[in-house]
Amino acid sequence: MKKDYSIIVGGAAGQGSRKAGLIISKIFKKLGYFVYIYDDYQSLIKGGHNFSQIRISDEFIAGRREKIDLLIAFDKKTIDLHEGMLNTGGALIFNKNKTPEEKGIGIEADAIVKHLQGKPIMANTAMIGGFLKVVGIEWAAAKTVLEKEFGGKDNINMTIAKEAYDSLKELIKIESNKKTKNPEYLMTGNEASALGAAKAGLDIYYAYPMTPASGLLHYFAEHEKELGVLTIQPENEIAVANEAVGSAYTGQRTMVASSSGGFALMSEVISFTAMAEIPVLFVNSQRMGPATGVPTYSGQSDLLFSINPGPGDFEKFVAAPANSEEAAIWSGKLLNLAWQYQTPAILLLDKELSEGTFSVNKSIFKDIKKEKELTWNKKGEYGRYKITEDGVSPLAYPGTKNAIIKASSYEHNERGLTEEENEGVITAMQEKRLRKFEEMRKIADSSDSIKVYGNKKSKIAIVSWGFTAGAVREVAEKMGLKFIQPIVVSPFPVKQMTKALQGSEQIILVESNALGQLGTIMASHGIYADKKILKYSSRPFSIEELEDRISKAIKA
């Protein structure tokens, strides 16, 4: 029998519900479960309502359910908002000192903390300890995780958690899951993207904080020395992009990240990198727009903008992973591809992927390596934009003997000198870059640019991308349907998509935007969806919602 549990940990901003949810998730990871965490929070420092929805399973998961099995409430508002989500037989665990009139499993969290002379915030530790007892997790199994989180066995948090644990009785038993070897890490999409790029030789990371991309900056800053990546926060997004270009010009592998509006500020610089053939990896972690939109919530409405982010004809690599493993793999791939083809590359994330936490296999990082770019052999006169058969010119960097290295946003000749009069030179340089683009399209149409799951013989094909693809994959597999997930969205892998769709009599597209933007891209290549399932409320699809809407689309 499949093991699948959903838990909500909720409270006001500042009460520590998010941290508590992460600690609980780490304990379940240690017990052998796949874990997915959906974090929901408002743009507030204190007050309001935050919650983490944790889902654990003995199979890979990447979506949330509408119904839950356990509710851990730090305040009354959490009970009011989420108690109705409990399944029959589900349990409410609450802070009895905050809401004494509630029916459920009350923990004297505040009283325990006061008795042990702890700080008020440590009530969340008491809630964790009580929860562990209620679900039948042995103290010894959780102890090592708690000690690591709290800084040792003698920490007061350990004493608080143990007293709360001992104060309750076991209600249900969540057994350990040791049948298969499950992933070793829990990582957000931001953390995985950072580590993947670092493994591919990233030298410098530039960013100005903007939710939900800020986690990348935090991760690089915290792990700067061990990753060997210099981390810099300039004064705004325009400065971020320009400084990154300057560093890449000198041979330093650079990466920048922002979200939607901040990414928009970088658009002229992205076009500049295409003209100057300077490789930079850009990350756009989408929020629900337009403009400032809904800052701490999600959407997939930047797809068309991300594949057309600046003026002029230029190709770029754009990949949209669905989970943390794919984010790590593709941040590394894109960094290498940017340097191989001397072009901008864009990693397209969204809030749910950037800040969601997923199970990650340690082994994937072994295959992410720095791949060597084409460099000048130091023979003859150096031409930064030398016309070649495949359009890729050898690189040299400032300080190289007998080489003058120019970079300009103007059209130029092979030596990098501005050209406005000679139409032959202008045409030749445009065609040089176009040849490079043709090579890029071949790479984009490789077998790993699209994934196919589920029943590959099904006449019904579901297509989705980015974070939304995770939940859609789960539902499609359950319903016996074919599921197709394009990861590379520019250049669009037409051959691979056409091959994946062979035999399909109905194509259903699922996206978290109002216009069906992937559908627009597919249609531009002669591939049309029969039905579109769209959501643009800033919240992700649930498993139950997808089951219902896909069933209706099939019957319609």
Where on the chain are the PLM-derived regions?
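Thiamine diphosphate
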Residues: 2-66, 70-79, 83, 211-308, ...
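Flexible, glycine/charged-enriched surface loops at secondary-structure junctions
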Residues: 38, 140-142, 154-160, 171-178, ...
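Generic beta-sheet signal
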Residues: 38, 93-95, 107, 257, ...
